Amino acid sequence: MPVTCTNYKLKCGGCPLLNQPYPDQLKHKQQLEQRLLGRFAPVSPVLGQAEPWHYRNKAIATFATGPRGRLTCGIYAAGTHRVLPYTDCLLQDTVINQTIAAVLEAARACRWPAFEEDRGTGLLRHVLVRRGKTSGQVLVVLVTAQENLPGSRNFVKALREKAPWVTSVVQNCNPRRTSAVLGSDVRTLYGPGKITDTLCGLQFAISPRSFYQVNPEQTEVLYAKAIEFAALTGKETVIDAYCGIGTIGLCAAGRAKQVIGVERNPDAVRNACANAAANKINNARFICADATDWMRAAAQPNSGLPHPDVVFLDPPREGSTPACIDAVAAMKPKRVVYVSCNPETLARDLTHLTRRGWKALKIQPVDMFPHTEHVETVVLLSHKKADSYIHIDVEFGEGE
């Protein structure tokens, strides 16, 4: 497919591989995985997407002051703070593209100014849009620099006239000088303040600040592979660390004895509990805690928690922590299934797990982000036999 994206030529940076044929992109990612992870286990061929366009169910656009002082919104040019006006992105869901255009028109009608980062003045910072792939529900999150939002009712009315498919509108206040998009304060302006979507046959509620995979089609491929690697028989206790809104854990619950999910984001934990109830899943519970802290406590001999047979690890891009990995190693589950969106931090964590007596058996890359450098990976690990490895801790005293 020839490149027809205007912003690609303007160096938006959102899809650096757009000019490469898709098979070549997959080859590039395969080579990356092999280089970083091939020493741990055989790397299976990357699972690509049949139609790798308009796959993203979430978009974030930044407001700025455009020519002649007119409000605009778009994406940053690569390596700059220059906002490129938003056009029809080839990666975003087409309804999301249309929604962002409608948000801009409605905001202009309200005469709201863009937030000026250098001066700390203005109102509008970002707009975040989510769309449920199966439900069609659309959530608009307007990120502002202050709580006061004059004319918010007029904005909702104008937006609904231009985009009647929008089902929820939320204001998120982020007054801090920060590169983080979302703040902590949320106010619902219209609708339930969240959307629902169906994934792997289950219904999930998704709130503004909750993590949810951006490519639903490939997410089902990813989770199916993770569940396959877990080899559940219905008798296992499963820990789902970094569980988010409970997607992996709830997908596993129907094949396990019990699931314990751990997540530090309170909104995500509330969503996870609601998702379990909505799907009538009674053998899963979710705990609001830092994954490392909770895993360390659970690994203690007198923790009172059931011994896990399977542990899912699905950390953010920075990977897990040495303390969390040590806790997993101490628990000695039968299997660990590590889901990673960053092969570099995955390689680091696999090195740590290997030193702690674990062995990677299978590595399966999944192309969750076509036309970008990113790739998702699922790894199956099991504990080495006691006589198959030697682990030695050496401490040196003074003068040694």
Named regions from a protein language model:
Residues 57, 136-138, 235-236:
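Nucleotide donor/acceptor-binding cores
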Residues 74-77, 141-143, 272:
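Short, acidic/hydrophobic/Gly-rich beta-strand patch recurrent on exposed beta strands
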Residues 2, 13-116, 129, 134, ...:
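Extended interfacial segments that mediate partner engagement and assembly in macromolecular machines
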Residues 62-64, 130, 143-145, 382-384, ...:
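Solvent-exposed residues in well-ordered beta-strands and their adjoining turns
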Residues 5-7, 12-15, 341:
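Short cysteine clusters
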Residues 129, 135-145, 203-207, 310:
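Short, aliphatic-rich beta-strand segments
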Residues 151-400:
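Rossmann-like S-adenosyl-L-methionine
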